Amino acid sequence: MKGLTLAAFLAACAIVPSAMAQRNELSGILGRTFISDQGIQGGPAFDSQLRFGNGLTFEVNYARRMMGSAAFALSVEVPFVVNLDEDIHAALPSKVPEGYKSFFATPAARLNLFPATAVSPWVSFGGGFAHFSESSNLLFGTTNPGKTGTTTGALQGGVGIDIKAFKSFSVRGEFRDFWTGLPQLNVDTGKSHQHNYFVGGGLVWHF
């Protein structure tokens, strides 16, 4: 009898409706975006690399838990990530824009492990769009003759960890890779896509 009671209790814990818990999240994350150097085809022999700065980046993210148990929680999230100052460095100042802004919006599914414990790791995967707003000025200071608005598709994969802090708040650290098309930088790198790596940390409000 005790065995049956214990089994029933464990089964009930596994199917507790998510409505019994705080189902919504709103998070604010601050970090940096990292982009690998790209070779410029036909660029100067002494320096043919297109280099990117590590732009200060922030994320606002809304998530809603759809189902879960003591072992896991599955949520739908909408990370919106903005990099307002991605500097560019190249030995072709009369061709390359001085920088650009980027905006990523990628609805995703996120799986948290052990969501009710003090520490909860998670993974996320989704897709949406990326928009690049290229500078109207070139590195040399003259007017950019190229396009100054580029929208592409985007895939997002991420990992992170949530640590309960106080009451309805958690501290979050995360890494996300946004795989997108390219901004219009007026040079040929031989690539059609790039990885935009976002690393950041911030607070999550559970309500």
Describe every region a protein language model picked out.
Residues 1-23:
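Cleavable N-terminal export/targeting peptides
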Residues 3, 21-23, 69-73, 116-120, ...:
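Strand-connecting loop/turn motifs
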Residues 20-66, 134, 198-207:
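Short glycine/proline- and aromatic-enriched beta-strand/turn motifs that initiate or cap beta-hairpins
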Residues 28-32, 76-82, 123-129, 161, ...:
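Transmembrane beta-barrel strands of outer-membrane/channel proteins
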Residues 37-51, 81-103, 130-151, 179-196:
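Flexible, solvent-exposed loop segments that connect beta-strands
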Residues 56-139, 196-207:
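Gram-negative (and chloroplast) outer-membrane scaffold detector with strong preference
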Residues 59-65, 158-160, 170-172:
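Short, conserved structural micro-motifs that define repeat-unit consensus positions
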Residues 163-207:
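Predominantly the C-terminal beta-signal and adjacent terminal strand-loop region
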